[in-house]
A protein has these predicted regions:
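Membrane-embedded alpha-helical bundles of multi-pass transporters/translocases
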Residues: 1-239
Length: 239
């Protein structure tokens, strides 16, 4: 969604850069998109990995889906979560190339990723079902790296310090979020039982606690993207 919203702005800056050679606006927009994607998807990935089992239990554990199948699917979700933020970054970087009318670059990288995915799927499926989503996660990392390298070569730099600063702060906040989510969920899961309403309560409480802790951590760590999101929310309320 972030990449889609920023696409018109990217296209405008790309057109200007093609005429003037000034990539500052384009560079700042790509950097902003990557930082906001990190702000939203890193904690989401961490929480979905840590709470994979209760999430799968609520969504699927009924009918022919037996309790002993839940850990297997939960492991797949946790493995897939490892590449979630990179998947979002790839969408943003693809839009950057599309706005520059160099569609062939992300297309070529995607084809390379397709072959890599096939090789890794063949190599990792033996470790268990979670090897397949892990392969996808690794390909997301590789694709993101390739897109960044090529894009930096075309626009000189990518505001790497700003991106690294945001990612570092968000990773620290997300680590605490993961700990709190687990600490809240585990005793509730043991105490309330495994009925569907009880699972909804325990998982809901863990997610609510995670959200509060993430907000507080981002405030303490001065994550600028939080202010942008809150400002957007205020403007939407006034609209």
């Amino acid at each position: 969604a972030i990449a889609t919203v920023l696409f018109p702005t990217l296209s405008r800056y790309a057109s200007t850069a093609a005429e003037t050679g000034d990539f500052r606006g384009f560079r700042d927009t790509v950097s902003s998109g990557l930082r906001h994607i990190s702000f939203t998807l890193i904690p989401a990935a961490v929480v979905s990995a840590v709470l994979a089992e209760p999430i799968i239990r609520i969504l699927f554990q009924r009918g022919q889906f037996a309790p002993n199948q839940t850990p297997v699917v939960a492991a797949c979700l946790a493995a897939f979560s490892a590449g979630l933020v990179f998947n979002g970054a790839m969408l943003m970087l693809n839009r950057a190339f599309f706005s520059m009318r160099t569609n062939w670059i992300p297309t070529g990288i995607a084809l390379g990723n397709l072959f890599l995915n096939a090789i890794l799927d063949f190599a990792l499926y033996r470790v268990g079902p979670w090897g397949i989503p892990l392969s996808t996660a690794i390909c997301n990392v590789a694709g993101t790296w390739a897109l960044i390298v090529v894009l930096r070569g075309r626009i000189t730099r990518l505001n790497g310090r700003e991106i690294a600063s945001t990612v570092t702060r968000v990773v620290v906040a997300s680590a605490l979020v993961a700990l709190v989510a687990w600490v809240v969920w585990k005793p509730l899961d043991s105490g309330l039982g495994r009925s569907f309403p009880a699972q909804v309560v325990s998982l809901g409480a863990a997610l609510a606690a995670a959200l509060v802790v993430y907000y507080a951590c981002c405030r303490v760590l001065r994550v600028r993207e939080l202010d942008v999101v809150l400002g957007l929310r205020s403007r939407l309320r006034r609209a």
